[in-house]
Amino acid sequence: MKFTDAGEVVEMTIDHLYVAGWTGRNKEAVDHHIAELAALGIAPPSQVPLYYRVSNALLTQSPMIEVLGDGTSGEVEPLLIQKHGDIWIGLASDHTDRQLEAHSVAASKQICPKPVAQELWKYDEIKEDLDALILRCLIQESGEWVTYQQGSLANIRPLA
């Protein structure tokens, strides 16, 4: 995949892809989310946080993705890539099939493409300011762009 870092093209081969779930810093908020999902029939995680191995072929930089049915949604997430001892940070979406999630969270993570942004930053250059970064996901509803999800990295566990 081709990314940019400060205007320079950086080519990355992604050999392994993991999706982290249940990563909130606030234990009470994580427990509340687990309870909300349990009410929808989704089994609680075996541990917190929980890491899911998914196919690296799911990564895409396409501006459009195709999914099966209308029961999917994205979640804006930080993307970490390690190459030759360096770590880069970017944006990704853990697009998930919410209906399948009630049967298997692991399968729900594996069935949808994972869009990733093209811009990366070297982790060491921004690590002191990570908690101030705001991740925002916009969706189009009735022809208008609206905020679907927004939060700072201060809401999740430290990345490294």
What are these regions (language model features)?
Residues 1-160:
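Catalytic-core "active-site belt" of small-molecule-metabolizing enzymes
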